[in-house]
Amino acid sequence: MRSTPLGTTAVSPASIKHNSYGYGRFVSSSGVSNFSIHRRRRHSSFSISQAPSQINSGACNASQIVDLFPAVSPEIVVREARLEDCWEVAETHCSSFFPGYSFPLDVVLRVDRLMAMVMGFSIPPGCQRTCLVAVIGSSVDETICFGSDDFKIGAFDAKISLNKGYVAGILTVDTVADYLPRKGPLRQRRTGIAYVSNVAVRENFRRKGIAKRLIWKAEALAKNWGCRAIGLHCDLNNLGATKLYKDQGFRSIKIPEGATWPQPKTSPDTRFTFMMKLVNNNNTQALEQFR
């Protein structure tokens, strides 16, 4: 799937500054299959406490609408996004990367992002793309799911749960290699390397280890897909994100002099560093091939 900053809306990327609360940078999904019912054993209970945002008189913005009904629980579950999560995923993305927009533009941005994710874009045969969500207030063991493990609508699993929880963080991981340097004189697409993008955590849930858990889950998926390494682009000015990735074992890869590597399409003054980490320790040469 080709990545676009906001899918369909004619908003100039140059007019949108990258926000330091997003962990890196953003990009967008697709996939297909049997019907199954998943019953998870309920082993614990949780309470829902309402902590509505203060809403001033007049029109409230999109983030305030979502924050009216948060499900609060100490448990964090990272899983693949489902169709029912789509609005909260769009809200988390836009509130992290495009804060400060008020009604009606904030709603337009969220609807645009939602359409881009649900409609999706085609991906090359044999490639994978998944949106992960960190959910507060719903245990994996408490969830009853209806739907298919394989069928997807855009970026989302076509499954519905009776107790879905509250999306606090998001991450996209794929093997499409749109933002990896091409290989050889024929500029072939690289294989065996997963790529992370769109890492964002809601402001109220930051500094709780959610981004780390999303990264861990992405690494596990990359291993499951048979990848030898995982990579990402990080805004050089986002020191918090840079430290996060370095603490998780990512290394900055120096671009060879004179080489032109693909980079995320954001505001022109944003500078990125490309970082990688081995997920298959049997292949110690995976990072050296980029030098």
Swiss-Prot record:
Keywords for this protein: Acetylation, Chloroplast, Plastid, Transferase, Transit peptide
Cellular component aspect of the GO annotation? chloroplast
* Broadest EC class assigned to this enzyme: transferase
Q: Which residues form the N-acetyltransferase domain?
A: 76-280
Coarsely, its chief localization is plastid
The EC number on file is 2.3.1.255, 2.3.1.48
BP term (GO), one: peptidyl-lysine acetylation
Tissue note: Expressed in green tissues.
Q: How is it modified after translation?
A: Autoacetylated at K-217, K-254 and K-265.
Q: Which domain of life is it from?
A: Eukaryota
Presence of the UniProt keyword Transferase in the record? yes
Q: What InterPro entries does the record tag this protein with? A: Acyl_CoA_acyltransferase, GNAT_dom
Which Gene Ontology MF annotations are present?
A: N-acetyltransferase activity
One Pfam family here: Acetyltransf_1
**Disulphide bridges:** none
**Catalytically driven reaction(s):** an N-terminal L-alpha-aminoacyl-[protein] + acetyl-CoA = N-terminal N(alpha)-acetyl-L-alpha-aminoacyl-[protein] + CoA + H(+); L-lysyl-[protein] + acetyl-CoA = N(6)-acetyl-L-lysyl-[protein] + CoA + H(+); N-terminal L-alanyl-[protein] + acetyl-CoA = N-terminal N(alpha)-acetyl-L-alanyl-[protein] + CoA + H(+); N-terminal L-seryl-[protein] + acetyl-CoA = N-terminal N(alpha)-acetyl-L-seryl-[protein] + CoA + H(+)
Q: Which residues carry this modification: N6-acetyllysine?
A: K217, K254, K265
What positions does the entry give for acetyl-CoA binding? V199, A200, V201, R207, K208, G209, I210, A211, K212, N238, L239, G240, Y245
Protein's job: Protein acetyltransferase with dual specificity triggering both N-alpha-acetylation (NTA), with a large spectrum of modified N-termini, including methionine, alanine, serine, threonine and to a lower extent glycine and valine as substrates, and epsilon-lysine acetylation (KA) of several plastid proteins.
Q: Indicate the quaternary assembly.
A: Oligomer.
* Family to which the UniProt record says this protein belongs: Belongs to the acetyltransferase family. GNAT subfamily.
The record's listing under PANTHER family reads: ACYL-COA N-ACYLTRANSFERASES (NAT) SUPERFAMILY PROTEIN, GCN5-RELATED N-ACETYLTRANSFERASE 4, CHLOROPLASTIC
Q: What is this protein called?
A: GCN5-related N-acetyltransferase 4, chloroplastic
Which organism's genome codes for this protein? Arabidopsis thaliana (Mouse-ear cress)
User: What gene name does this entry carry?
Assistant: GNAT4
